[in-house]
Amino acid sequence: MIEPFIYPVATLIAGVDEVGRGPLVGAVVTAAVILDPARPIVGLADSKKLSEKRRLALYDEIVEKALSWSLGRAEPDEIDQLNILHATMLAMQRAVAGLHIAPDMVLIDGNRCPKLPMRSQAVVKGDSRVAEISAASILAKVTRDREMTELDREFPDYGFAQHKGYPTAFHLERLAALGATEHHRRSFAPVRRVLAL
């Protein structure tokens, strides 16, 4: 049983989540969403627990109904320079900065917050407990999955559309056989090993 979340007192709450910390390739993508209480969205949940079809339908509904939404990202070279944690925090800051309405409270999935110019609170399992974070997780996941499908067209031998860049056995085998693309994260151990050969 997931513990229900008690919302802080605030006028405009943004939810923030990230997708893509674990993959060996591509950007880490974040989203920030301020929902409109007058236009509720039914069925918001952690993006990982939704079917792709449901995620896509909710993505369109969130984009249409949210008071404000924004995407942020950190590219592979930034991940390599900063490390994945700091790059994720930077991408979250970018998502919040991109909102055209400034929230007075930001709820962030996980156990730590980036430095922000407004109040913020980390919420463990927030993508299952907080509607705004669920919405952000859906926007971030759909966006990153689409990017991996695009990358798959550019590099069809790696299987990016299937594994989304995560270190599956197939991805590791392709990496060993073909080498790293320019989009691979060079600081991640499996990529580093291939580059050292």
UniProtKB/Swiss-Prot annotation:
Top EC class for this record: hydrolase
- Residue ranges annotated for the RNase H type-2 domain, each copy included: 11-197
**MF (Gene Ontology):** manganese ion binding; RNA binding; RNA-DNA hybrid ribonuclease activity
Q: Does the keyword Disulfide bond apply?
A: no
Which top-rank group of organisms is this from? Bacteria
**Catalysed reactions listed for this entry:** Endonucleolytic cleavage to 5'-phosphomonoester
Essential cofactor(s): Mn(2+); Mg(2+)
Q: Which EC number applies?
A: 3.1.26.4
**Coiled coil (residue ranges):** none
| Record keywords | Cytoplasm, Endonuclease, Hydrolase, Manganese, Metal-binding, Nuclease
Residue sites binding a divalent metal cation per the record: 17-18, 109
Where it sits in the cell: the answer is:
Cytoplasm
State the free-text cofactor note.
Manganese or magnesium. Binds 1 divalent metal ion per monomer in the absence of substrate. May bind a second metal ion after substrate binding.
Q: Name one GO biological process term.
A: DNA replication, removal of RNA primer
Q: Which NCBIfam families match?
A: PRK00015.1-1, PRK00015.1-3, PRK00015.1-4
Describe its function.
Endonuclease that specifically degrades the RNA of RNA-DNA hybrids.
- Which family is annotated? Belongs to the RNase HII family.
The protein here is known as Ribonuclease HII
**Source organism:** Serratia proteamaculans (strain 568)
